[in-house]
Amino acid sequence: QRQMCIRDSFYGVQTFLQMVNEKKELPVGTVTDEPRFAYRGMMLDVSRHFFDVNFVKKQIDAFAYYKLNRLHLHLTDAAGWRIEIDKYPRLTEFAAWREFPTWKEWWNNGRQYSEEGSENAYGGYYTKEDIRELVAYAESRYITVIPEIEMPAHSEEVLTAYPELSCTHEPYKQADFCVGNEKTFEFLENVLTEVMELFPSEYIHIGGDEAGKASWPTCKLCQARMKKEGLKDVNELQSYLIHRIEVFLNGHNRKLLGWDEILEGGLAPNATVMSWRGTEGGMKAVESGHKAIMTPGEFCYFDSYQDAPDSQPEAIGGYLPLSKVYSFNPVPDTLSAEKVGLVYGVQANLFTEYIPTPEHAEMMIYPRVLALAEVAWSAPSKKNYEDFHVRALKAVEELKKSGYNPFELKNEIGNRPGADKPVEHLAVGKKVTYGLDAAYYPGYAAGGDTALVDGVRGGWTYGDKRWQGFIDKKRMDITIDLEKETELHFIGADFMQVCGP
């Protein structure tokens, strides 16, 4: 109880500091306040780009000021292993280092790892003492640090350092652990044991996303495991791994947290789902009685462009302005009252494939994390974007004075010109016929057969569901029936080309 009072006083002080104006004046009044969600988080990907301890501490200071209380560290991925594990020294001697400083260069040039200390080796890792220092620093600001150790996928760096843990035992060939191999579980449990000794967090994040499972159908050990356990497909094989790791974590008084793919093949009994592919996975978890943390890419992925792409450094794509982050409501209106409490919180994520420097990372985080913090703290009825925007402009100036590198909100261009108002033309509402084998790709249907004549232009990203995609046949064949002979003065269309990294 005393600890809760101290924590609440800490948040009260943050509110007080935020209300003081430039003249050191404070408005007269009474503040009655409480957070909407228990979990208010930010994820930092330190694998694709390694950030040193001082940088992470600096972000903790800001996150605490805006009343976030969870820092999720994405410690492992193909681009580099970032935490010291005594039992497996090759993870930091080799898997923590790569040939190129930027993810894009590394990805496009063979994706090779390097020995620590070799020429041109880029990377790094946190020693155990570093982790203890970070955890204590965060705890003093009422932030819990949650570690993520990826499994069964996103593990190329591990499987190149220890290829015997893959299905084919070949370095540089596999991304998924061999779930049929007992040595895999020995490795994972040993790693998690050392991780739990460093992180007192309630949750241990195990990833669980984007498993290709390509080798599992032909791997003798995986097939033997499936037969022995009565598993009907590779999704259930992944679920077997998740269930088994959960039992291990629960045995150490910890809870399992994973991306929404952990639903595939059956959700582990006590798991919490972090829903990133929309909110559907989170809702599925909640309806089955599990907690969910909402972090859909559409609203919470800060690696997307936050302004007109041609005015910004290269990003992974998308368009996520401050206003859209602020508009996010993690609890759908359709959710029953008794289930609302299972929406445990929200989180923003900064994956760093296209984040080459600490300064760039801060530009992508701020001020969008302020919007996320308000989503996490304030009830929808208490929110007003116009008021928030004024406060965000002030916050940007304060952040700059404190040595941060936020996005210059005052220079924001906004959405693509014309995207927010309807276009009037002769083809609006007319019938569209697509040629044989030249229809749009179902995954990018936009408004379906009427999308091209609905009078609505696309914005900066195809993610706005206004752009119709043609990717299968690399061609399009469209007929628009104007119903009568019509004099035309202009024929045109907008096109967007999206290429891979």
Model-based region annotation:
Residues 2-6:
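Short, small-residue-biased leader/transition segments that mark boundaries at the very start
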Residues 12-37:
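N-terminal carbohydrate-binding accessory modules
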Residues 38, 42-254:
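Substrate-binding cleft of carbohydrate-active enzyme catalytic domains
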Residues 46, 75, 350, 436, ...:
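Residues that line or immediately flank small-molecule/substrate-binding pockets and catalytic motifs
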Residues 76, 209, 351, 374, ...:
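Flexible loop residues that form catalytic
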Residues 133, 142, 153, 185-203, ...:
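Substrate-binding groove of N-acetylhexosamine-processing glycoside hydrolases
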Residues 415-488, 496-500:
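Disordered, acidic Ser/Thr/Pro-rich linker "stalks" and the adjacent N-terminal cap
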